[in-house]
Amino acid sequence: MAYKNAIMAADDTLVASFERCLELGAVPTVHAENGELVYHLQRKLMAQGITGPEAHPLSRPSQVEGEAASRAIRIAETLGTPLYLVHVSTKEALDEITYARGKGQPVYGEVLAGHLLLDDSVYRDPD
């Protein structure tokens, strides 16, 4: 989850953290992005000379968030813990949350105002 070489948590860390949250009665929070895939795409873009802000959305196609959201939700479901997903920005992630909630799973999603008001064109703006 999240950012490779920074704050990425592997699945074993997620499992241990979710278990600890369950023991404490806390709700785990996840920023759902497949960090390995983002890192791979970033390297490919850099090799192509795409190094400006426009590379940001190109390195994060919607599947990157959808897959990670699905994985986090399934881990939480298996362990019986609620889950709070932050910065939800794709239909794929929303679909995963909606599906889980439809089954009665305590999964919540948060969106940033910018995700509701802006699109990827802001990364191509010369200003």
Where are these regions (language model features)?
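Histidine/acidic residue-rich metal-binding segments in metalloenzymes
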Residues: 6-127
